Amino acid sequence: MTIKDIAREAGCSVGTVSRVLNHNPTVRAATRARVTAVMQQYGYQPNANAKHLKQHVREGLALVIKGTQNALFADLLDKLQACVEARGYTPTVYYINEASDEMATVQMICTERRPHGIFFIGSHPHCFTPALANLGLPCLLLTNNAAEQHIPNLSSVSVDDRAAAAALITRLARRGHKVIGIIGGDPADSRPSQRRLSGCRDAMAQLRLPFDFDTQYAFADFSMEEGYQAAGQLVDKCPGLTAIFAMSDLMALGAIRALQDRGLRVPQDMAVAGYDGIVLGRYTVPRLTTIRQNTTVLAERAADILLRCIEENAPAAHEIVPFEWVEGESV
């Protein structure tokens, strides 16, 4: 009788059986009782030497962060680390750039670390292929919805970007803004930009607001510098512009500075709204109005879902968490 046999009979993962053997307190009582009953039924006795050798690597989780300049991801990472450490796991963080191959990164991590599971923050769903299922360990994507990928071991937790962007445009319209410019990434390459642009289009169509992509959309790479440049482009090419929606808070802060450098007052001459709800936006002048992604809820739900997959062999799950409107002073 091997540990794999015990896991199969108990209906859980090998990692969960290992945690029971190591007396890890994070295993749920019902799961521990089920595993213990199977071991007693078959008279299973663990190999003490093997247990000692493997114990130090059995509690590992990998956290893969795509993009090193994103303030939202930094906050999310801190809270996610705290969540998994409280459950008895040791996270190892890997930073990858925008051009990195997630599947190659996963193969490297599994070869070097043999983790229980992997979190991805900031990756795009299309980066994952069905080959991910062959690795045999639970994975979870944060900040993007992976339900449409139909990969059996890939879960996701995210905000509904489309609905959030639509809600923001609706609020701007209710305050009298009819010509609204948008700063965002390339919708062809960025899933968040695509979803948020779709939400903007939904609201504008419903409210019968004008929208011309060529004059009312400016490309930027989610940084303050790019937001600064994009805001200037919108002012130059879009007559009648009275409000700007930037698809990240950092771009919004850059946009505000660009407008001020041109002698425009925010919000008296031009309203600016962001997206993410990072801490920095609370301390700018004016204080930033934005859509907040609640990083505490995102981290808690992500940790709970992935650890259920690890400890209880639960199926992949895809959860949408609520977004929040943050009333600042920039609209």
Regions found by a protein language model. Give the residues of each.
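N-terminal helix-turn-helix DNA-binding module of bacterial transcription factors
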Residues: 1-58
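Hinge/beta->alpha junction and helix N-cap segments in small-molecule ligand-binding domains
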Residues: 65-75, 93-101, 156-167, 183-230, ...
